[in-house]
Amino acid sequence: MSARPQADFDGKAFAARLSTAPGVYRMYAADDSLLYVGKAGALRKRVGSYFNGTPKNARLTSMLSQVARMDVTVTRSEAEALLLENQLIKSLSPRYNVSLRDDKSYPYVLLTREDWPRIALHRGPRAVNGRYFGPYAGVTAVRETLNLMHKLFKLRSCEDSVFRNRSRPCLQYQIGRCSAPCVDLVAAQDYQEAVRRATMFLEGKSDQLGEEIMHSMQQASEALEFERAARLRDLLSSLRSMQNRQYVDGRAADLDVLACATQSSQACVLLLSFRDGRNLGTRSFFPKTNGEDSAEEILAAFVSQYYAEHAPPREILLDRAIPDAELIEAALSAAAEHKVALKWNVRGERAGYLLLASRNAQLTLVTELTSQSAQHARSEALREMLGLAEQVKRVECFDISHTMGEATVASCVVFDASGPVRGQYRRFNISGITPGDDYAAMRQAIERRFRRAVEENGVLPDVLLIDGGAGQLAQAQAALADLGIENVLLVGVAKGEERRAGHEALILADGRELRPGAASPALQFIQQVRDEAHRFAITGHRGRRQKARMTSKLEDIPGIGPRRRASLLKHFGGLVGLKAAGEAEIARVEGVNAALAARIYANLHGLALPDAAGESSP
């Protein structure tokens, strides 16, 4: 997720649009130089803390005064955010992070390079000759890995000074966690083989290692070496019970992960990159589209164009299949002079990467659509299209939602030049109309909203959008006329051909019809507002419908009146809790005896109802 450069960056507004998920945030100056990278357990809270109140010190004041934009990357956990933060700091060297982080904060697994290698936890500078695996999110993760290494491969952990002076095996040998190379109880060749296998495991090559051990086990069985075969069998069993990899290794293969999100005729392609096994974070791209391109087509074009200028890794994960995949794959392979594989049907860790990229693409696109600079541009385009003399400061949109006339709800959403003003959204439960009469529902909602504005001298919108055609627009016109409101510009948003986005017709109160086209920033703004009104109406309708259906289930039971119904729902926290209860538990509710409890249970579970004679309905 990102915010584009602005003259005066509004950190509070940016933070308010973030999710509460864990992740990493990055602050950039106006010249696009990276100022700071940090991690957060809850992005909205952490980022917002920078812009609430006075900065705590001069360094923070200086840094925040230079912020022109921010990016965030959502992660699956705070531990993953910590790893990504460390990797970004190392690879990008942000100006204000230099004195805040060093390797002492992050533990590694060290496998030394010597005649009898040892495996151990390591912090600090990499002064010891060996392979370093990590960084890990914490000491606990390293210790779990070391415990596994000792159990599976029986590698030593003692310091060299201890190793050189032992005359008999230590306790680690006695409990089966070391092969005692210190007193020559294991051949050098066998120990080096154990080191090789441990390295394969730490590199994430568990599948290859498992196949190798399986082959060795079969060979041992054929040679009637049953004891060795049993040891290999146990090793294979333990290996398969572990996760394939628990860290990011410095020598893992390069990988790019691409996800595409589309909304309101706009698209975002998010690139998540790994180089030398390190997560380098995300980059967001907003390709120009004609409003009719599918996400698959947009992603295919991006892959072709982006990797024409950037060296592709050997593996590129895509969140969907793309047209001409084989052709693109062949072209990239030829240009790169190495095999480039495009993949989308993946499992395990790679599926997690795709999910992460897809989630970030959606969040980034939503942020882009609601970012202040983009909203100002679209708002200005709307003003020009409608021929208004002044800036559009407030837009409202109404939509109706119901299921075959049931539980009709109208929504009213509010946007200003900076985006949605969610605190002023309103829903109206529609009643007293013929079920399914959208015209009457729209008129009732408009009357209720604007009558209150007239009575209380409330704020009126500059533009009022009505999701519907000429009929819905006429109802809104009549409602405003009855209330004496004349200075609100009405616009009906009629669905386009085959209900395709970008083909909407805008109907004005004087009968004129505008078709600005998918590429129009003004229409994109209208689409965004209309889609938000639609979402808000559907959410309200579903909640009202569910509540009505829950209540009606109890109303159908003889002996259940309003008082008992309220007691039951309050006691169990709703119908779901009531359905999960047994007859005895239901009978504990005040005013419910055993016979009534049996009837309630039977009704909720579709069983034959007991006789209801003799029950009243309080």
Curated annotation (Swiss-Prot):
<keyword id="KW-0267">Excision nuclease</keyword>
<dbReference type="GO" id="GO:0005737">
    <property type="term" value="C:cytoplasm"/>
</dbReference>
<dbReference type="GO" id="GO:0009432">
    <property type="term" value="P:SOS response"/>
</dbReference>
<dbReference type="InterPro" id="IPR001943">
    <property type="entry name" value="UVR_dom"/>
</dbReference>
<dbReference type="InterPro" id="IPR036876">
    <property type="entry name" value="UVR_dom_sf"/>
</dbReference>
<dbReference type="Pfam" id="PF22920">
    <property type="entry name" value="UvrC_RNaseH"/>
</dbReference>
<dbReference type="InterPro" id="IPR003583">
    <property type="entry name" value="Hlx-hairpin-Hlx_DNA-bd_motif"/>
</dbReference>
<dbReference type="GO" id="GO:0009381">
    <property type="term" value="F:excinuclease ABC activity"/>
</dbReference>
<feature type="domain" description="UVR">
    <location>
        <begin position="207"/>
        <end position="242"/>
    </location>
</feature>
<comment type="function">
    <text>The UvrABC repair system catalyzes the recognition and processing of DNA lesions. UvrC both incises the 5' and 3' sides of the lesion. The N-terminal half is responsible for the 3' incision and the C-terminal half is responsible for the 5' incision.</text>
</comment>
<dbReference type="InterPro" id="IPR035901">
    <property type="entry name" value="GIY-YIG_endonuc_sf"/>
</dbReference>
<comment type="subunit">
    <text>Interacts with UvrB in an incision complex.</text>
</comment>
<keyword id="KW-0742">SOS response</keyword>
<dbReference type="InterPro" id="IPR050066">
    <property type="entry name" value="UvrABC_protein_C"/>
</dbReference>
<feature type="domain" description="GIY-YIG">
    <location>
        <begin position="20"/>
        <end position="98"/>
    </location>
</feature>
<dbReference type="InterPro" id="IPR001162">
    <property type="entry name" value="UvrC_RNase_H_dom"/>
</dbReference>
<dbReference type="Pfam" id="PF02151">
    <property type="entry name" value="UVR"/>
</dbReference>
<comment type="similarity">
    <text>Belongs to the UvrC family.</text>
</comment>
<keyword id="KW-0228">DNA excision</keyword>
<dbReference type="InterPro" id="IPR000305">
    <property type="entry name" value="GIY-YIG_endonuc"/>
</dbReference>
<keyword id="KW-0963">Cytoplasm</keyword>
<dbReference type="GO" id="GO:0006289">
    <property type="term" value="P:nucleotide-excision repair"/>
</dbReference>
<dbReference type="InterPro" id="IPR038476">
    <property type="entry name" value="UvrC_RNase_H_dom_sf"/>
</dbReference>
<dbReference type="Pfam" id="PF14520">
    <property type="entry name" value="HHH_5"/>
</dbReference>
<protein>
    <recommendedName>
        <fullName>UvrABC system protein C</fullName>
    </recommendedName>
</protein>
<dbReference type="GO" id="GO:0009380">
    <property type="term" value="C:excinuclease repair complex"/>
</dbReference>
<dbReference type="Pfam" id="PF08459">
    <property type="entry name" value="UvrC_RNaseH_dom"/>
</dbReference>
<dbReference type="Pfam" id="PF01541">
    <property type="entry name" value="GIY-YIG"/>
</dbReference>
<dbReference type="InterPro" id="IPR010994">
    <property type="entry name" value="RuvA_2-like"/>
</dbReference>
<dbReference type="InterPro" id="IPR047296">
    <property type="entry name" value="GIY-YIG_UvrC_Cho"/>
</dbReference>
<keyword id="KW-0227">DNA damage</keyword>
<dbReference type="InterPro" id="IPR004791">
    <property type="entry name" value="UvrC"/>
</dbReference>
<dbReference type="GO" id="GO:0003677">
    <property type="term" value="F:DNA binding"/>
</dbReference>
<keyword id="KW-0234">DNA repair</keyword>
